[in-house]
Amino acid sequence: METSRQNPTTSRAKAKSTEATVRLPREALTPEDHLEILKQLYLARYFDVRLIKEKRRGRLTGTLYSSHNQEGILVGTLFGLRPDDWISPIHRDMPAFFMKDLRAGWDNPDRLGMSVEEVCAQVWCRSGSPGRARDNWSHIGSRSKHIIHSTSMLAGTIPVAAGVVLADRLNGGDAVVLTYNGEGSTAQGVFHEAINFAAVHKLPVITIVENNMWAYGTPVELECPTEDVARRADGYGIPGLIADGQDVFDVYDKVMTAIEYARAGNGPSIVECKTFRAYGHGDHDDDRAAKYRPNDEVEEGRSRDPIAVCKRYLVEKGYLSKAEAEQYHAENKGAQQATDEDFPPDVVAYLKKGVDYAIKSPTPPAEEGGMWVFAE
């Protein structure tokens, strides 16, 4: 049976909210903030590009879960957080681990986010990595950095996130937590249980739904009976907002609206970010994805690169000249086509520092294989 599918990054990226906003949160951003947002988009994209190249050169093992074309969600959600706020990333949010609290300074050792060296060591399964070389991807966390441990059971960390901010409230705090989920995970029973609990107790849990239209190989119309996943919020009596995931500033506006609502004691929100997955579920699925996704859907999704959308907006606002916008060309290029010259030199140097650290770090000795299995 064939169904008519619309790309959410264009025809369905409508702004919907139960809360009217007179002044957009982005209006409080400085010109420097706008340029920093673009730079962070480049950083998230370069992380993806560099790792895919390393994997295809045989210098990296394990599975990669690309965030290519979804960087607007990462940057737009993280940029407005306070250092003491919490995040709960998933497998497609690997840059979030080192991009949390990046506004405090990329090389600031005191910022509440992991270092790029730590995250790269995790990817290369090196000694001293957050996962102690037991895993090469996102199954890591840090209480001191306010990052909730990621798991393969999608939506499974939402109850944990609710518990974290409940404890914070009981201790007199007003931190919020962002939980990241794919649209497929909203059909999980634990998603309902956690959101219902957060709504009843008015907990500051902001659920970011990265709707890239596919839960592995299952299309969104077989996952959710409504056109907009955010409508699930209606059943809990909480706001359901919809953002254009390709527009980092629209994501920022919607998430900041939800953050302000939560921090004021009003409770949780769901923010659906309509986006497009550039590749397969993981790099093991790239070839298969080329067969199960319609070509026109792929072409339309790739036509709205979040870096290009951001650059156009910055030029329109006068924060970026046309010459500056044309200086780098990472947008609309696949990982194999993009080169270091397509990115700002400081972005390349920053990630190279992490990659070099990981490659030079030792692998753990065999005798550590039985350690950290049980609490001692």
Model regions and ranges:
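Cofactor-binding active-site loop characterized by glycine-rich and histidine/acidic residues
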Residues: V49-I52, R57-H201, P219-P225, A230-G237
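Short acidic/polar alpha-helix capping motifs at helix-coil junctions
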Residues: A15-T18, L38, S127-P130, N196, ...
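Residues that form or immediately flank small-molecule/cofactor binding pockets and catalytic motifs
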Residues: Y46, R92, G245
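Short acidic, gly/pro-rich beta-turn/loop elements at beta-sheet edges
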Residues: F97-M99, G217, H281, E368
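Conserved acidic/glycine
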Residues: M1-I73, F79, H281, D285-E376
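A general secondary-structure junction signal
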Residues: H91, C273-T275, V373
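Glycine-rich ThDP/TPP pyrophosphate-binding loop and its adjacent helix/strand module
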Residues: I147-D356, K360
